[in-house]
């Protein structure tokens, strides 16, 4: 599943491409109904066509696209979702769907966007989703962008890049494992399996430890490690360990810099031990048994 660095990379890619452009075409294939969460295709069409994109925002792993009529499009990529920006091919709108050369068979939702001034070329935004676990919502009228009535979005904790040490210390006062706290989007938004494992390794802390067992020094180390690995993930434009690509269809490269994630059986980069894998809260968890302290 795309995590904060992957989603933020996509947001930074699409923001300059679509802000100020008008939605001039919209196609939803039948399978798009699996992605649409709260409205039907007709309602989506009626509330978005001819509207202009005003900005693009990321909250946790959600992508938020407000329009100039106060409607808001919200997207979540799920496990395999992608957002791609493409040039408009020199064929009719309908013809684009007759061949994978123009529209991939896993693209179930497509928006054409036009520059009202005519200065920029028209573009297409493709929502591509192999497994159909991605989500798209439309809020037809929203007065406060900070209060979007979508349950998972409304319950998000502080963003992992912006969380303060005071907030981080507070959420770690728990008997839950550190890994499960890092993955709980209600506690801290944006961290997933990859970056939780990498942050725990960077901080030298065992992922099974209870949050409340951390000393003040360890809390600071883990807080800094979370921010550091996320920023490194952004630097390398995300981790492409499965389906993820940026908005141009290019893979990220942070997977080349992973220290523990999916490194089971390999030698630790800092010692002679082998990386271990266990199941924790239903998720595969990777760590070095020597470098990561289990505490007292």
What are these regions (language model features)?
Residues 23-44, 57, 167-296:
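Basic, nucleic-acid-binding surfaces and adjacent catalytic neighborhoods in DNA/RNA-processing proteins
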Residues 1-4, 101, 162, 215-223:
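Generic detection of long, well-ordered alpha-helical segments
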Residues 73-190, 195-202, 210:
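Phosphate/anion-contacting hairpin/loop surfaces
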Residues 1-134:
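Gly/Gly-Pro- and Ser/Thr-rich, intrinsically disordered tail segments characteristic of DNA damage-repair
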Residues 5, 9, 166, 224:
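Short, contiguous clusters of charged residues that form electrostatic/catalytic patches at enzyme active sites
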């Amino acid at each position: 599943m795309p995590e904060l660095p992957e989603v933020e990379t996509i947001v930074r890619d699409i923001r300059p491409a679509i802000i100020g452009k008008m939605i001039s075409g919209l196609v939803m294939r039948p399978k798009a109904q699996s992605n649409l969460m709260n409205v039907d295709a007709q309602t989506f069409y009626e509330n978005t066509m001819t509207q202009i994109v005003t900005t693009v925002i990321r909250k946790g792993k959600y992508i938020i696209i407000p329009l100039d009529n106060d409607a808001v499009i919200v997207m979540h990529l799920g496990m395999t979702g992608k957002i791609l920006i493409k040039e408009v091919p020199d064929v009719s709108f309908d013809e684009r769907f007759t061949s994978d050369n123009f529209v991939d068979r896993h693209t179930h939702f497509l928006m054409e966007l036009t520059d009202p001034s005519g200065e920029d070329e028209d573009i297409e935004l493709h929502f591509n989703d192999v497994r159909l676990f991605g989500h798209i919502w439309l809020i037809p009228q929203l007065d406060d962008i900070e209060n979007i009535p979508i349950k998972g979005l409304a319950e998000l904790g502080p963003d992992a890049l912006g969380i303060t040490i005071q907030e981080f210390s507070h959420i770690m006062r728990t008997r839950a494992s550190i890994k499960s706290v890092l993955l709980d989007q209600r506690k801290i938004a944006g961290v997933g399996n990859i970056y939780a494992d990498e942050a725990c390794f960077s901080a030298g802390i065992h992922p099974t430890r209870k949050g409340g067992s951390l000393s003040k020094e360890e809390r600071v180390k883990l807080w800094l490690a979370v921010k550091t690995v996320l920023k490194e993930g952004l630097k390398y434009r995300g981790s492409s360990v499965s389906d993820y690509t940026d908005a141009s269809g290019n893979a990220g490269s942070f997977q080349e810099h992973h220290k523990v994630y999916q490194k089971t059986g390999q030698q630790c980069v800092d010692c002679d031990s082998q990386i271990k894998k266990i199941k924790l809260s239903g998720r595969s968890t990777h760590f070095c048994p020597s470098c990561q302290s289990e505490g007292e």
